[in-house]
């Protein structure tokens, strides 16, 4: 998928759907015809807008440098390696820090990225790959799962891993292990769906050959 230039924000962020186009950067929607669109298309549009916000956040430094320094001091005091920093550790730190009002997974991802001092591989080509896989995932969840909501931190970590954007943004596990296993099951079913779709339609990997490699994911522990 090639992202075209948006006439509004002048970024290469135009994604085409049947009957309309939208920009993942400035959220502009451009109607191509008067046909009423399916609700699912606009559902995907909203999800991609949120994805845009996540990608922008990961490439920014909105978190105060004082907060990062404080976290690094705690790590040094307790001899905690950057390799051991995950979403659970950062979330616990944020909950104990009264100076931070908004504690969401985007902030957690940003802090992990800064603490590990990692340069994310988010070139235009990589962004295209992430957007394409995420779009198929949203459609799959919409058609095959009871809930239309998506655990962004869980699935973006999976997508970032297979696209080699980063392996460091590990999501926070939840106390409900059934929910963790359910997300893993959805991901594995999505990969199986994409492999099956490839065989049926003879589409050449959607430009993402790695999506169809069996050994890239582990077996889900949820019995069905």
UniProtKB/Swiss-Prot annotation:
InterPro entries: Poxvirus_VLTF3 (IPR007031), VLTF-3_Zn_ribbon (IPR014900)
GO molecular function list: zinc ion binding
Reported impact of residue 6 to S: Complete loss of transactivation
UniProt keywords, alphabetically: Activator, Late protein, Metal-binding, Transcription, Transcription regulation, Zinc, Zinc-finger
Chain segments annotated as transmembrane: none
Domain of life assignment: Viruses
UniProt record, GO biological process: DNA-templated viral transcription; regulation of viral transcription
Function summary: Acts with RNA polymerase to initiate transcription from late gene promoters.
Family membership: Belongs to the orthopoxvirus VLTF-3/OPG127 family.
Subunit note: Interacts with the late transcription elongation factor VLTF-4/OPG110. Interacts with the late transcription factors VLTF-1/OPG093.
Protein name from the UniProt record: Viral late gene transcription factor 3
Organism: Vaccinia virus (strain Western Reserve) (VACV)
Encoding gene (name): OPG127
């Amino acid at each position: 998928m090639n992202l075209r230039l948006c006439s509004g924000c002048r970024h290469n962020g135009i994604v085409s759907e049947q009957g309309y186009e939208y920009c993942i950067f400035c959220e502009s929607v451009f109607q191509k015809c008067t046909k009423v669109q399916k609700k699912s298309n606009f559902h995907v549009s909203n999800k991609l807008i949120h994805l845009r916000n996540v990608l922008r956040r990961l490439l920014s430094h909105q978190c105060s440098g004082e907060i990062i320094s404080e976290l690094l001091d705690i790590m040094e005091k307790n001899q905690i390696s950057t390799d051991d920093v995950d979403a659970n550790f950062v979330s616990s730190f944020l909950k104990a820090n009264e100076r931070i009002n908004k504690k969401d997974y985007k902030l957690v991802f940003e802090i992990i990225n800064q603490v590990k001092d990692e340069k994310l591989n988010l070139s235009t080509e990589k962004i295209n790959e992430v957007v394409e896989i995420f779009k198929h995932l949203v459609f799959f969840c919409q058609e095959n799962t009871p809930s239309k909501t998506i655990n962004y931190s869980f699935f973006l970590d999976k997508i970032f891993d297979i696209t080699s954007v980063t392996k460091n943004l590990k999501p926070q596990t939840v106390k409900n292990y059934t929910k963790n296993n359910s997300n893993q099951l959805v991901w594995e079913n999505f990969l199986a769906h994409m492999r099956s779709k490839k065989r049926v339609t003879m589409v050449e990997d959607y430009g993402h050959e790695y999506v169809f490699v069996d050994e890239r994911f582990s077996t889900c522990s949820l019995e069905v």
